[in-house]
């Protein structure tokens, strides 16, 4: 149910963005028609100011609002999957009276500890969870870049860049910037990325049910 709420929320907000951009484009077109019909009526200074204002509105929506929203959705969805995996592992531990739980395992992240628990305690074959497990693991890297590096990868972070680049196709782009040093910004240019994430979360837990690991 929570995932459906995420899906509905994403559609609602994305539709609002699309509507706002369409309205600004119509406004720009209508103004330009008036100017073309009566060019002497409008001073160049006024025209430039008007164009700048409309362009700024579009940039604000497309670059600032849309990017912030999609990055926020990605981090929230990963937090959901991480929390849910922890819950199902803890539930499995209690139901099957396992001698060790997540807190007894070592890992670089809660996601890694969950993987260890699933393979050792629930005898889950991670290969059977593909392609969803690898997808979520790649999403973890995207989320970490958003949260810890403000969606930025520096040019000398070759391994990180290559990992994010290999997962990016059809989901986001790495926009190169060059000031004092080369770096890349993650630009989430595909609104369908959010739905794709949700489908992979659902697919993962559907496969986990075969091992009696339930939500």
Where are the regions that the model predicts?
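Short, mixed-charge amphipathic alpha-helical segments
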Residues: 118-160
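Extended intrinsically disordered or low-complexity regions, especially N/C-terminal cytosolic tails and loops
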Residues: 1-75, 83, 131-137, 141, ...
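Hydrophobic/aromatic-lined pockets within catalytic cores
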Residues: 82-85, 89, 93, 97, ...
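Short, charged low-complexity intrinsically disordered segments located at boundaries
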Residues: 42-48, 108-116, 147-152, 171-175
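Short, contiguous, well-structured surface segments enriched in hydrophobic/aromatic residues
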Residues: 74-116
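Poly-acidic low-complexity segments
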Residues: 101-105, 154, 190
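Short, flexible active-site loops
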Residues: 62, 66-69, 99, 121-128
């Amino acid at each position: 149910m929570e995932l459906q709420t995420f899906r509905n929320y994403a559609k609602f907000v994305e539709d609002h963005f699309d509507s706002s951009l369409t309205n600004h484009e119509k406004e720009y077109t209508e103004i330009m028609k008036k100017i073309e019909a009566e060019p002497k009526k409008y001073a160049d200074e006024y025209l430039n100011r008007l164009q700048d204002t409309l362009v700024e509105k579009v940039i604000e929506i497309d670059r600032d609002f849309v990017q912030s929203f999609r990055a926020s959705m990605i981090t929230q969805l990963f937090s959901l999957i991480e929390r849910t995996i922890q819950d199902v592992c803890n539930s499995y531990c209690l139901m099957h009276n396992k001698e060790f739980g997540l807190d007894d395992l070592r890992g670089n992240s809660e996601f890694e500890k969950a993987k260890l628990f699933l393979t050792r305690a629930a005898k889950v074959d991670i290969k059977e969870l593909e392609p969803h497990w690898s997808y979520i693991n790649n999403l973890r890297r995207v989320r970490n870049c958003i949260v810890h590096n403000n969606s930025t990868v520096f040019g000398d972070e070759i391994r990180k860049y290559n990992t994010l680049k290999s997962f990016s196709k059809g989901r986001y782009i790495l926009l190169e910037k060059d000031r004092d040093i080369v770096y890349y910004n993650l630009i989430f240019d595909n609104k369908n990325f959010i739905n794709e994430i949700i489908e992979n979360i659902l697919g993962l837990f559907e496969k986990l049910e075969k091992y009696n690991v339930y939500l």
